[in-house]
């Protein structure tokens, strides 16, 4: 972990990239930016560990971050993948001595913006609409967590893999002449952990989808969704 100076952020107002701050005018954004601490992490480095005291709002500025828990069997379970503009630690804003109930690891080189609980309280008092946006995001995450739990409990591997590709397509995809090109935020092992299958299973299912003409695999880090309708049929 490295502390970094980020004067460019202060002039470009990087906080405007964060959905919960998007409605603020330039003066209020400047106040937010003045309270931000900037940190950088290398790929694989822990940003926080389950059980650590949570006393700040952490915003992803660059890169991807995975949130994980350890199962009773001692295996890693990825519960969420965060991208620039996403955040965690919001529950600490409303609870005293809140502890992280997950660990966060950098999936790539990562830069974060951290706002202390005290700084966020000041921001929320001056801009109460941000509280509503945070609670809306928390509600969305609870629904996603329920969907993930149901997916892991009831759906077979074909549905899980298709759902994962669809999710990544929505979050990381962009349209090309060949279809929706997706830059995968994680490797095969992490993808397998995310949906509760083995690495061999996810490789086999991806090959099956490619052979069916639904997707094309471009190395290990990119895929192209060639037929979204047929992908939905697998779900």
Protein language model regions, located:
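Cyclic-nucleotide recognition modules
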Residues: 29, 80-143
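Structural motif
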Residues: 64, 109-111, 214, 221-222
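Phosphate-/nucleic-acid-contacting segments
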Residues: 170-235
């Amino acid at each position: 972990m490295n502390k970094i100076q980020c004067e460019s952020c202060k002039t470009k107002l990087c906080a405007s990239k964060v959905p919960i701050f998007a409605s603020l005018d330039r003066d209020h954004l400047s106040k937010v930016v003045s309270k931000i601490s900037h940190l950088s992490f290398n790929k694989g480095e822990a940003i926080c560990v389950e059980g650590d005291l949570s006393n700040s709002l952490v915003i992803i500025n660059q890169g991807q971050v995975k949130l994980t828990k350890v199962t009773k069997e001692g295996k890693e379970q990825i519960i969420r993948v965060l991208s620039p503009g996403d955040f965690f630690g919001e529950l600490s804003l409303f609870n005293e001595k809140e502890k992280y109930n997950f660990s966060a690891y950098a999936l790539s080189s990562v830069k974060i913006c951290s706002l202390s609980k005290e700084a966020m309280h000041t921001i929320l008092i001056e801009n109460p609409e941000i509280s509503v946006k945070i609670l809306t995001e928390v509600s969305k995450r609870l629904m996603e967590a329920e969907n993930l739990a149901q997916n892991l409990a009831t759906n077979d591997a074909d549905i899980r893999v298709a759902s994962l590709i669809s999710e990544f397509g929505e979050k990381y995809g962009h349209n090309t002449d060949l279809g929706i090109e997706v830059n995968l935020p994680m490797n095969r092992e992490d993808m397998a952990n995310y949906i509760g299958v083995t690495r061999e299973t996810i490789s086999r299912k991806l090959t099956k989808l490619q052979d069916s003409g639904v997707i094309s695999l471009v190395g290990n880090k990119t895929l192209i969704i060639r037929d979204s309708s047929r992908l939905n049929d697998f779900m």
